[in-house]
Amino acid sequence: MRMKKTVAVIGAGNVGEHVASLILLKNLANVKMFDLPRKTEEKVFEPVKGKALDMKQMLAAMDIDARVEGYTVTPEGEGYEPLEGSDIVVITAGFPRRPGMSREDLLEANIRIISVIADRIKRYAPDAIVIVVTNPVDVMTYVAYKLLNFPKNRVMGMAGVLDSARFKTFISEELMVSPKDIHAYVIGGHGDEMVPLISISNVGGIPLKDLLPKEKLEKIIERTRFGGGEIVNLMGTSAYYAPAAAIVDMIEALVQNSKRILPCSVYLDGEAGEYYGVQGFCVGVPVKLGSNGVEEIIKVPMIEEEREMWRRSVESVKKTVEVAEGILSAGSSRQ
């Protein structure tokens, strides 16, 4: 019987805690959660330990034989020693964008967080596969890749799996068919410039463009692009059920060595980079996921209209990467 893998989840907020609970409910792996304390004037709370205890009792109630622990850490990086032995590390920790905060402010704040976490992963889990969720995800995946100095197959970002799930949801609602029978990919940067690949999307083998008129497809694409914002406007907070499920989809492929083809943000260079017109940064493309991480980058065909959308998406990510490079350089020169 093979040893159960261990997944570390850094950041046990809405997304992180749902990732942990889904992993446990599917009995995919043991889980370690890491998060900051919550301080009030009267008391210092350790919510991550409380969540882990709650999940232990959930497992007992459901007769699931898995382990979960919660560890309180500091912003400076103390308390990460239990990362040791983790096979997969998921980074969900990060600041959301707040009113009055520029994109550069957000970048700088989250680069600081990723820098501390990357250092601790290198120290305690040097053989782990790392999944980055912190936004802006393509840029933070690149930052993590550069700071970790891991082989590129072991660092990836979650974006396209979620965007593709949203795309499939809206197609499913429009056509009144099961999402299981819809094959559709969204690639590119995780943002307004994402690229839904209509030309290769199909429902039960029938091309999507033969089932929906262009104007309806355009509305679905627009809704997909702003799918996260739609949820924020309804709930007053970011989505977490679907992002968590998308992350667990990736984890399942890694743990079970299932060779799934999933769109992930990965570092592109060489032959694959030449095909996609990207050299030296991370952006979302279909990849084969297995026990070694990213085992192959799939070269997906695109029609000219999609190629143009792809170029715009890549350019948008590249500009933000350049800003991040400046922040990283400034940070290293201060040390």
From Swiss-Prot:
<dbReference type="InterPro" id="IPR015955">
    <property type="entry name" value="Lactate_DH/Glyco_Ohase_4_C"/>
</dbReference>
<comment type="similarity">
    <text>Belongs to the LDH/MDH superfamily. MDH type 3 family.</text>
</comment>
<feature type="binding site">
    <location>
        <position position="103"/>
    </location>
    <ligand>
        <name>substrate</name>
    </ligand>
</feature>
<dbReference type="InterPro" id="IPR036291">
    <property type="entry name" value="NAD(P)-bd_dom_sf"/>
</dbReference>
<keyword id="KW-0520">NAD</keyword>
<dbReference type="GO" id="GO:0030060">
    <property type="term" value="F:L-malate dehydrogenase (NAD+) activity"/>
</dbReference>
<feature type="binding site">
    <location>
        <position position="35"/>
    </location>
    <ligand>
        <name>NAD(+)</name>
    </ligand>
</feature>
<dbReference type="InterPro" id="IPR011275">
    <property type="entry name" value="Malate_DH_type3"/>
</dbReference>
<dbReference type="InterPro" id="IPR022383">
    <property type="entry name" value="Lactate/malate_DH_C"/>
</dbReference>
<feature type="binding site">
    <location>
        <begin position="11"/>
        <end position="16"/>
    </location>
    <ligand>
        <name>NAD(+)</name>
    </ligand>
</feature>
<feature type="binding site">
    <location>
        <begin position="133"/>
        <end position="135"/>
    </location>
    <ligand>
        <name>NAD(+)</name>
    </ligand>
</feature>
<protein>
    <recommendedName>
        <fullName>Malate dehydrogenase 1</fullName>
        <ecNumber>1.1.1.37</ecNumber>
    </recommendedName>
</protein>
<dbReference type="InterPro" id="IPR001557">
    <property type="entry name" value="L-lactate/malate_DH"/>
</dbReference>
<dbReference type="GO" id="GO:0005737">
    <property type="term" value="C:cytoplasm"/>
</dbReference>
<feature type="binding site">
    <location>
        <position position="110"/>
    </location>
    <ligand>
        <name>NAD(+)</name>
    </ligand>
</feature>
<feature type="binding site">
    <location>
        <position position="166"/>
    </location>
    <ligand>
        <name>substrate</name>
    </ligand>
</feature>
<feature type="binding site">
    <location>
        <position position="135"/>
    </location>
    <ligand>
        <name>substrate</name>
    </ligand>
</feature>
<comment type="function">
    <text>Catalyzes the reversible oxidation of malate to oxaloacetate.</text>
</comment>
<keyword id="KW-0816">Tricarboxylic acid cycle</keyword>
<keyword id="KW-0560">Oxidoreductase</keyword>
<dbReference type="GO" id="GO:0019752">
    <property type="term" value="P:carboxylic acid metabolic process"/>
</dbReference>
<dbReference type="Pfam" id="PF02866">
    <property type="entry name" value="Ldh_1_C"/>
</dbReference>
<feature type="active site" description="Proton acceptor">
    <location>
        <position position="190"/>
    </location>
</feature>
<feature type="binding site">
    <location>
        <position position="97"/>
    </location>
    <ligand>
        <name>substrate</name>
    </ligand>
</feature>
<dbReference type="GO" id="GO:0006099">
    <property type="term" value="P:tricarboxylic acid cycle"/>
</dbReference>
<dbReference type="InterPro" id="IPR001236">
    <property type="entry name" value="Lactate/malate_DH_N"/>
</dbReference>
<dbReference type="Pfam" id="PF00056">
    <property type="entry name" value="Ldh_1_N"/>
</dbReference>
